[in-house]
């Protein structure tokens, strides 16, 4: 036999799951326990006390002799007297042998003493008293075993089946209801989600960050109220400062909120301070944010928990209706008296028996109690169904939490996640409020901000400040959760680089950085406060923005009216959005340099907004063919133009309209012919032409018309010779024809009296003409990776030479006349070590002498 505790364990759940048990589930659990007790009590009573006692229905007295077995009349008349006789036991107590229906008829062949053991002691007493009693009751002439047989037969035939099986049915129904109530806690696919949810919910509820976030919200509200009250008064109140020191306060939001703190002397405005969480608590809180984010993504995908709860509620309701329908019909069927016709007349001599059921009254009361309990249970099930279908439980809104707190970004959730939160609200709404804190990105960012400021102190940031190539103080922050507050205390910083900081916020404190003129935002769509924007608008001179999509460019970038240089690096023409473009640049009134590295198919028309004052335009197109360049015609004030990696095949005609153009760079295109170069004669200010890294095979003679050229770059092309027209450019100072197929240097090179830099590296030159050394102003002469066999002694005429490259040639020695190149030092001489060793000792010593030595001696 099982105990109540063993069966009731079906209704047990983990204590932590109680937060998901609304009042109706708890009430139904208790009702189920009561029904279980009723069923077990009824079953126990039935097993131990249940009896049916039957008596035959005797014929009328006139016919009684007809039913008396012949030859036994005398004996049977004496048996009743003997059966009701009394005797005293050894202790002197009087007992009565009550076996009215348990004796059998005595036959003449069997002694009376053998049939009744007590007759030996009772008969002498009876004979002594000589009392003769008349028989009482009516004779049935049935044996004890016959009565037992009849009782058993009538128990199964005359007794209604429900009277016999009610306890077992009640037990089975109750167990089914218990299992149905808690099946969603046991089913693996839902149990795992519920377990994770309860675990995360408990940690969120106990997290110090939840308490701190809620207290900061309350503090913010009180600060705002204080500001409104203070603003309405003409005179400041003198408030003790001790009460404000212990209260937590929120960090500065996007629109700066400052709290007021008054001293006894005068009111002082202060930014509320922030208490730093313990490092361990901060790490745990950050882990909770990650867990909540992953759990939400996992649970919101399905509504299995909701459907299972609805199904089990429907099952319980159907079970209630079924139980109520068939049990109500059997209440009146349970009675104390029953008429039994077992058809055993051939065994007992009687056809009809009158029976009594001793448990009838108890079973009837228990059944009525069970029906009453199941009715209450059913009404609760109906209420549960009403609640399930009246409210959209697959949607949960944190609107009330958003109104009561500063976390207005707490998202609404759906499906199983929403249903679980609705269930928690039936237990305690405070759980959902605290849980919502971990769904807020604002809350997570605040936590990151606290941890970040705790980790990146002023001293640590000072250690990361370095000097860049322009000798400016530079700080580079990479892959942080935000911008530490201590950064804005580095007032002497010139350059600030923020890379891969998606939640970067620039507060008003940046106005302290009076030396800041250059800002780099690499995949960092920074947000700025109004005060910070005003400072950047007036002081920022150079801005670098690197992005993946044009949407990552902060909107405030286009409003920096004092910006001088803007560098945009990213995708401005993605495959999914062909119409992507820059916003209006009209507000950039002082922009001088615009650098765009992207994949444009046409020059953005918005660039014309800055045409009146733009002096340098750079477009690096990363191999995407630039088809439309008509907008360039409007860039009348551009002095420097770079169109690199634009897959240009010819020099664009739009360039010839740029009358103020001084430098043109068409690097890394697909230009093969430059016959249009004659049109450059109209660009009177053009001094530098860079056509390097193309596929040019020849320089047309018409280049001689571009008389103002001072720098000419044709490196990394396919030139095989240099036309004499090049050497008619008397103003030429730099000529770069490196990495071509040039085999000879024309003697006309001596005409370039102003030539200072000559680069012929990576060609096939084997002889250096003597006329080359007439270019006495040469400072750089790169002759590496050629076929030169000897270096003429006239190298001594190049007294201003500071760099000479000879590495990769066929030289076997160096002339001693190198010593007469007084400006040339070993650091500027690029040659093999064995060739350097061929120089005389005094020449090597002269080359090894530091240029700064004479100046050092003179100090």
From Swiss-Prot:
GO terms for cellular component: cytoplasm; endoplasmic reticulum membrane; membrane; monoatomic ion channel complex; plasma membrane. Residues 228-252 have a biased composition (Polar residues). It is a multi-pass membrane protein. The chain crosses the membrane at residues 23-48, 165-183, 310-331, 362-387. InterPro entries: Leu-rich_rpt, Leu-rich_rpt_typical-subtyp, LRR_dom_sf, LRR_domain-containing, LRRC8_Pannexin-like. GO terms for molecular function: volume-sensitive anion channel activity. It holds the Pfam family LRR_8. Expressed in pancreatic beta cells. Also expressed in glucagon-secreting pancreatic alpha cells. Disulfide bonds join 54-355. Residues 110-138, 222-252 are annotated as: Disordered. Residues 49-164, 332-361 are extracellular. It comes from the Eukaryota. Residues 1-22, 184-309, 388-859 are cytoplasmic. It catalyses: chloride(in) = chloride(out); iodide(out) = iodide(in); taurine(out) = taurine(in). LRR repeats lie at residues 515-535, 539-560, 562-583, 590-610, 613-633, 637-658, 660-681, 685-706, 708-729, 731-752, 754-775, 777-798, 800-821. Residues 127-138 have a biased composition (Basic and acidic residues). Heterohexamer; oligomerizes with other LRRC8 proteins (LRRC8A, LRRC8B, LRRC8C and/or LRRC8E) to form a heterohexamer. In vivo, the subunit composition may depend primarily on expression levels, and heterooligomeric channels containing various proportions of the different LRRC8 proteins may coexist. Belongs to the LRRC8 family. The volume-regulated anion channel (VRAC) channel forms a trimer of dimers, with symmetry mismatch between the pore-forming domain and the cytosolic LRR repeats, a topology similar to gap junction proteins. This is Volume-regulated anion channel subunit LRRC8D. It comes from Mus musculus (Mouse).
């Amino acid at each position: 036999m099982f105990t109540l505790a063993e069966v009731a364990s079906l209704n047990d759940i983990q204590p932590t799951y109680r937060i998901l048990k609304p009042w109706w589930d708890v009430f139904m659990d208790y009702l189920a326990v009561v029904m279980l007790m009723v069923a077990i009590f009824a079953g126990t009573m039935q097993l131990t006390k249940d009896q049916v006692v039957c008596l035959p229905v005797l014929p009328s007295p006139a016919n009684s002799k007809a039913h008396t077995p012949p030859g036994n009349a005398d004996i049977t008349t004496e048996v009743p007297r003997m059966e009701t006789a009394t005797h005293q036991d050894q202790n002197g107590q009087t007992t009565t042998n009550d076996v009215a229906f348990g004796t059998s008829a005595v036959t003449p062949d069997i002694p009376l003493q053998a049939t009744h053991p007590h007759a030996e002691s009772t008969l002498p007493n009876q004979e002594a008293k000589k009392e003769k009693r008349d028989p009482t009751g009516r004779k049935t002439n049935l044996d004890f075993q016959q009565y037992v047989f009849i009782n058993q037969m009538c128990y199964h035939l005359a007794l209604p089946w429900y009277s016999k099986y009610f306890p077992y049915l009640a037990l089975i129904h109750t167990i089914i209801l218990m299992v149905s109530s808690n099946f969603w806690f046991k089913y693996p696919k839902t149990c795992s989600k519920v377990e994770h949810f309860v675990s995360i919910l408990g940690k969120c509820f106990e997290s110090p960050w939840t308490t701190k976030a809620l207290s900061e919200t309350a503090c913010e509200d009180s600060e705002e109220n204080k500001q409104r009250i203070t603003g309405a008064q003409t005179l400041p109140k003198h408030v003790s400062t001790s009460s404000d020191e212990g209260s937590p306060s929120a960090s500065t939001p996007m629109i700066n909120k400052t709290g007021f703190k008054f001293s006894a002397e005068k009111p002082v405005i202060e930014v509320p301070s922030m208490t730093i969480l313990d490092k361990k608590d901060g790490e745990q809180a950050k882990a909770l944010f990650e867990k909540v984010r992953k759990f939400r993504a996992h649970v919101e995908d399905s509504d299995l928990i909701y459907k299972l709860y609805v199904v089990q509620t429907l099952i319980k309701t159907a079970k209630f209706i079924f139980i109520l329908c068939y049990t109500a019909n059997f209440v009146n069927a349970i009675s104390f008296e029953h008429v039994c016709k077992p058809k055993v007349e051939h065994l007992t001599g009687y056809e009809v028996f009158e029976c009594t059921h001793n448990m009838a009254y108890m079973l009837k009361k228990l059944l009525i109690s069970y029906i009453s309990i199941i009715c209450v249970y059913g009404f609760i099930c109906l209420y549960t169904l009403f609640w399930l279908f009246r409210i959209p439980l697959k949607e949960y809104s944190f609107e009330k939490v958003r109104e009561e707190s500063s976390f207005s970004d707490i998202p609404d959730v759906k499906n199983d996640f929403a249903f679980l939160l609705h269930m928690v609200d039936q237990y305690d709404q405070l759980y959902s409020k605290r849980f919502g804190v971990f769904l807020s990105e604002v809350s997570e960012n605040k936590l990151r901000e606290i941890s970040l400021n705790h980790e990146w102190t002023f001293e640590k940031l000072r250690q990361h400040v370095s000097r860049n190539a322009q000798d400016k103080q530079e700080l580079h922050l990479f892959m942080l959760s935000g911008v530490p507050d201590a950064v804005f205390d580095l007032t002497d910083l010139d350059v600030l680089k923020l890379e891969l900081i998606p939640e970067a916020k620039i507060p008003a404190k940046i106005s302290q950085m009076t030396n800041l003129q250059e800002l780099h935002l690499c995949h960092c769509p920074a947000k700025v406060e109004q005060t910070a924007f005003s400072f950047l608008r007036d002081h920022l001179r150079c801005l670098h923005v690197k992005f993946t999509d044009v949407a990552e460019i902060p909107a405030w970038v286009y409003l920096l009216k004092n910006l001088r240089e803007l560098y945009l690096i990213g995708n401005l023409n993605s495959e999914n959005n062909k119409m992507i473009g820059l916003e209006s640049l009209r507000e950039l009134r002082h922009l001088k340099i615009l650098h765009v590295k992207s994949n444009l198919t046409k020059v953005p028309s918005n660039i014309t907004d800055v045409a009146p004052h733009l002096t340098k335009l750079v477009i690096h197109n990363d191999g995407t063919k630039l088809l439309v360049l008509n907008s360039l015609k409007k860039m009348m004030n551009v002095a420097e133009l770079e169109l690199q990696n634009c897959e240009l095949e010819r020099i664009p005609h739009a360039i010839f309209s740029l009358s103020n153009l001084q430098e043109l760079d068409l690097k890394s295109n697909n230009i093969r012919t430059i016959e249009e170069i004659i049109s450059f004669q109209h660009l009177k200010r053009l001094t530098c032409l860079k056509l390097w890294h193309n596929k040019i095979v020849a320089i047309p003679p018409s280049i001689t018309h571009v008389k103002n050229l001072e720098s000419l770059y044709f490196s990394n092309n396919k030139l095989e010779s240099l036309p004499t027209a090049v050497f008619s450019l008397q103003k030429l100072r730099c000529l770069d024809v490196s990495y071509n197929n040039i085999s000879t240097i024309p003697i006309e090179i001596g005409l370039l009296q102003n030539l200072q830099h000559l680069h012929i590296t990576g060609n096939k030159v084997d002889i250096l003409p003597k006329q080359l050394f007439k270019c006495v102003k040469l400072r750089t002469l790169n002759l590496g990776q050629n076929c030169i066999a000897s270096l003429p002694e006239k190298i001594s005429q190049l007294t201003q030479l500071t760099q000479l490259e000879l590495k990769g040639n066929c030289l076997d020695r160096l002339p001693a006349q190198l010593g007469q190149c007084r400006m040339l030092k070993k650091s500027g001489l690029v040659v093999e070590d064995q060739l350097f060793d061929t120089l005389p000792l005094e020449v090597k010593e002269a080359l090894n002498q530091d240029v700064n030595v004479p100046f050092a001696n003179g100090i």
